[in-house]
């Protein structure tokens, strides 16, 4: 026979799985009036606070279109009945979002109108309706709310989703564009810690970069061309050459506007082709089938964990492969993304490893593999 606490948790899990609110899930049962269930949606208000936080990179980060040594970020906390959920918005340049736009958006969010934090769909539908964009700001609220709800349930989200943490894959570690000497140093520094590398290409010296890495490591490599190859014939020639160098997948080989050219490349490619810049939200997934073999889901682009889970589910239904990625982020957002990792083919969750001022301890990389804890919510603690 269940005790009261176990009953409430069971009701909460049932509510999330069925789309009911906690109040609806509890409606058919008689709960003693002397038993407090404030933490499961019978009173109290959610309070959200947020503040800017600049992420400092350990090394200058260079891709095909820019270089940077910091990344703007906004930290979010949602408190309910003494329990706090954490989230964040990370804003690399290409997102087109800034600290000012994120702060302005968050000031419009009124969570106090909701009594039940388990009303995830209602709350996040409301948050999404505030503006057509602001995906990173929306993701910050989504992550914090998922962390809060998971903590109230006493379970990590991978368990709530029915996943097994042992199935989490290895994560890639990104080697940014740099001089040959620096790239060799970076590769040697991490080669013994990771099982697969990721290399940013899309410049004239692409082959030289791969040869530089191959001079010191034979690890499998995932390639992110960052839309850098403009001609489809050049892109296909590069992919054939890269396959001979032990590359295992290609991400966004061509500009997102060149979908037909990308489809031509994908249909003839000996390696799987994944969408990154061509993909943002759930509504984009179906249109990419045929043009790409898979998709790279990033919380900062898709508004968070709720939509990421839907995108993953749809991609699987369309027989597409899935990668879970990240921006330069603290362990907060990386750990949130990692909750989905047992269900994906590839993971690129090294954003927290690229910064020197992480605020959290969360997902770990052990012998190159994503290792999830049993901590509830998104599995993080503040440092």
Predicted segments with their positions:
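Metal-dependent enolase-superfamily TIM-barrel catalytic cores that perform enediolate-based chemistry
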Residues: 157-269
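N-terminal secretory signal peptides
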Residues: 1-3
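Short Pro/Gly-enriched beta-strand edge/turn motifs at strand-loop
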Residues: 54-62
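Catalytic alpha/beta core domains of metabolic enzymes, predominantly
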Residues: 257-262, 268, 274, 278-349
